[in-house]
């Protein structure tokens, strides 16, 4: 029997396990392609509240759509513990954002690589209606 705890958002028909949380998934070159370890690390740091220098500057205003409280001096999201980041099947191109308390899906972050610098991530937000 699987020991992972299942959480489900019935309203949005979104189900995930604790194994799908970004903070819990291991990096795999084959499963996470075209993203590299550095890109994975940037996303993992984001799930801990740190906005890395390899996140495109325009993406910060996108992240604020989730009501993230971002300190521009430190590039830290002060209310990060109100959110969970979920990645299904190691697909780093879509990071689902979940309310940590209610387990409802708020939307997702579309992740893409910058055409000019593959180390820089471009993040766009799609909110759940």
UniProtKB/Swiss-Prot annotation:
Taxonomy, superkingdom: Viruses
InterPro entries reported for this sequence: DUF424
Name of the protein in its database record: Uncharacterized 14.6 kDa protein in EGT-IAP1 intergenic region
């Amino acid at each position: 029997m699987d020991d992972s705890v299942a959480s489900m958002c019935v309203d949005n028909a979104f189900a995930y396990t604790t194994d799908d949380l970004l903070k819990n998934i291991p990096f795999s070159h084959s499963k996470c392609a075209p993203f590299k370890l550095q890109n994975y690390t940037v996303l993992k740091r984001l799930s801990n509240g740190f906005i890395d220098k390899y996140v495109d500057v325009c993406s910060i205003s996108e992240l604020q759509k989730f009501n993230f409280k971002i300190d521009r001096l430190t590039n830290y999201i002060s209310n990060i513990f109100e959110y969970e980041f979920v990645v299904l099947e190691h697909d780093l191109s879509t990071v689902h954002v979940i309310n940590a308390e209610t387990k409802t899906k708020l939307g997702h972050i579309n992740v893409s690589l910058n055409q000019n610098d593959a180390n820089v991530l471009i993040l766009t937000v799609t909110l759940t209606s």
